[in-house]
Design a protein with these regions (language model features):
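Catalytic-site microenvironment of enzymes
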Residues: 2-263
Length: 265
């Protein structure tokens, strides 16, 4: 009896399954609010995630099966999915543009609204005021954060002429060495993924400098991503299918992990 009791107390903790760590973010919506923290890959890192447009400005508009696709809704959904991926890897995340009702959505056509705020503040209609507002919030949070690796990620959905299919394009601020490195690591990750999942298609996305307001006026190292052409019928598949939106978020997260890992080498 003593031997059996001894085995129970010694082996039980070893055999018991370790309870997974979890977090909760209401902005993800009821179905996705709770997430598991599966690794510490991004422990000590902090991210400022900004989806394009929002509030009174829907951004680019495409037509899919007779219904409108609004850029701000798709950029926001992907930002939320990216935030969840980063949090699951142990990162600290600030979601700058917020809609307390939407959450992560799995539908094809994401209904448009003007509810979005910038950290709770109404979003101005004036473009410069709108961009300044989000940059000011990023910079304010940046000054408070003590993390050693801090990055801002801006996500948009490109709207070129209807006939052009686009890939994913990565931009960094002029002369930003760290921004360029992050953009390159994201690009290489996408290139590998396309080679694996669509080997006959090829990946034609590029990395380049771009003198954008948000890249010039944010303090943390920043990248700006154009995720597709919302007006192109073929390219719309990258946006309307939930699995594709999730894949975009996954790949961006993997590229970020790669970028951080290279610093530690």
């Amino acid at each position: 009896v003593l031997f059996v009791t001894f085995l129970f107390f010694v082996l039980s903790p070893l055999l018991a399954k370790k309870k997974p760590r979890t977090g909760k973010e209401a902005l993800f919506g009821k179905e996705y609010a709770t997430y598991q923290i599966t690794s510490n890959e991004l422990s000590g890192a902090c991210f400022y995630l900004v989806s394009g447009h929002g509030g009174p400005d829907p951004g680019a508009i495409g037509i899919y099966q007779g219904r409108q696709l609004h850029e701000d809704e798709y950029a926001y959904d992907i930002i939320l999915r990216l935030a969840r991926e980063l949090l699951s890897r142990g990162a600290k995340v600030h979601i700058i543009i917020q809609d307390k009702k939407d959450g992560i959505r799995d539908g094809h056509v994401l209904a448009n609204s003007k509810r979005e705020t910038c950290m709770g503040d109404p979003i101005p209609l004036n473009q410069v005021a709108r961009l300044k507002q989000r940059c000011d919030w990023v910079n304010k949070l940046y000054r408070k954060d003590k993390s050693s690796y801090k990055r801002a990620v801006f996500i948009h959905v490109d709207s070129r002429s209807k006939g052009q299919q686009t890939d994913v394009f990565f931009y960094n601020a002029p002369k930003s060495t760290k921004g360029r490195r992050l953009a390159n690591n994201l690009h290489r990750t996408f290139d590998r993924k396309y080679d694996k999942h669509q080997p006959n298609r090829g990946f034609r996305g590029t990395v380049s400098e771009r003198n954008l307001y948000v890249l010039r006026n944010t303090t943390p190292v920043a990248v700006f991503l154009e995720l597709g052409n919302i007006r192109n019928k073929r390219d719309q598949q990258r946006l309307v299918l939930k699995n594709n939106r999730q894949a975009l978020a996954n790949w961006i997260a993997e590229g970020i992990v790669k970028d951080l890992s290279l610093i530690h080498i």
